[in-house]
Amino acid sequence: MSISRREFLGSAAAALAAGAPVESYRPNLLPSQKEVWDWQVWMAKLGPKYTGNPAHVQFVDFLAAQLKSAGLEVARERYTFPRWEARRWELSIAPASEKPFRAPVTSYFPYSGQTPASGVTGELVFAGSNPSFRLDQLHGKIALIDFACNVRKFGEIYEPWGIHPADAAFPTSIRPARGAVNDLTQFQKAGAVGVVLAWTDVSDANAADQYTPFSRPPQNIPGLYVGRETGARLRSLASPLASGGAKATLILEAQTFPDSPTDTLIATLAGASDESIIVNTHTDGTNATEENGGIGIVALARYFSRIPKSERKRTLVFPLTTGHFAGPWVPSIRGVITKYPELIKKTVAAVTVEHLGCREWMDGASFRYRATGENEWSVAITETKSTAQALLEALHGSASRRTAVVNPVHGGWLGEGASLTRAGIPTIGYIPQPNYLLAAPADGCIEKLSAELMYSQIQDFAKTIHILDRIPAIELKKS
């Protein structure tokens, strides 16, 4: 089911979306699409940028250099934390009545635990399906569990301010490929020596390399994921369902780096007044889109730095934070809010930029993972009518098709914009949610992104910031 055009809320926003183009926007001042895409391709080749790893450090240094070269004042905030990094993972099964075999592993549970090079071995026991687990009789054994991905019920939590294009059908729910079990400590406390988590409702190609869940504290028990068919086979061999049972050897070699440094950047472009607009993202992530918001911000910073200060009513502040993938230790945008209360008081609006250029990839009925030929839905979350209207006006004539500007009336704030909203700032949180968001293949999912879409989205943000800059602060806060 989908929300039809007749069900859209905010008729005034729809009228704005049909209005004139943003006159203050100067496309010739924006870095070219080729330049932006070249940055994107370079970034993807770095590999996963898990918080504080060498690729992430290199990316943050690149962003800082680009922002400084555009004339912005760039400050760094350093954090340290115990960085965990997986080195090698493997799962071997020795059934009582079959030949031993190596089970294909789709990925590992981040910050779960680690084993010696020889792994840990124990009887494979099926401990249930999420969320109902049987924790008795797991001592010294390897727990096998399975799960279905959680549904995000857009139709229940969001009310659209408007949709671009207006005749597009915004889905009432999605089920992105995300691990649904966020805590393994219950199995560790029950005495298990390892956990195997089996996907049940996505293809193996979709499940491959998923770094999920992220931002969890150490679990103190190693966990590996297997695909749908492998999970079904293991379940048929595991106790108590199988008469003879099977032994499993789970290997997850990992290393922890205590006191690993990681930096947040705060770049400032002074305007004609002390009032500020925050444009933020995070810099750590798994692939080419998670997180490429920093590339978008570099393009935006270069664009606005080429406009005379006298024509920029407000100061632009660009926090590019670390810690999105290390939440137990590093506060990401919450750290900026806590440390700079005067900035927050002077900020009249915020735009959070995440996950640019996403094209839609879905599992078909036969579990064939493929491109649909459409853009991924971009969900722009905002609680205030003024910010919603600003984005809808910016979207007029945009190539960023399948954008939903929504009011989170029943929750559903996702991403780095949530904390800014809680701090009382009218915020637009732009957050596409593709299946591959947390996947970390060698190519960084670059083939799933569109240079044209990414560039169009950056243009939309530039126009939105222009519009926000001209709206009085008192009007921006009106719901």
Where are these regions (language model features)?
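Metal-dependent peptidase/peptidase-like ectodomains
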Residues: 272-274, 321-429
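Zn-dependent metallopeptidase/amidohydrolase metal-coordination segment
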Residues: 406-458
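His/Asp/Glu-rich mid-to-C-terminal helical/loop segments that flank catalytic regions of hydrolases
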Residues: 222, 316, 435-479
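Noncatalytic luminal/extracellular "stalk/propeptide" segments of secretory-pathway proteins
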Residues: 29-33, 41, 45-162
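Alpha-helical metal-binding/catalytic segments enriched in His/Glu/Asp
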Residues: 67, 277-328, 461
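N-terminal export signals
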Residues: 7-23
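Soluble metallo-hydrolase cores and metallopeptidase-like ectodomains found primarily
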Residues: 106-136, 213-291, 299-307
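Second-shell loop/turn segments in exported
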Residues: 25-30, 46-54, 168-177, 182-183, ...
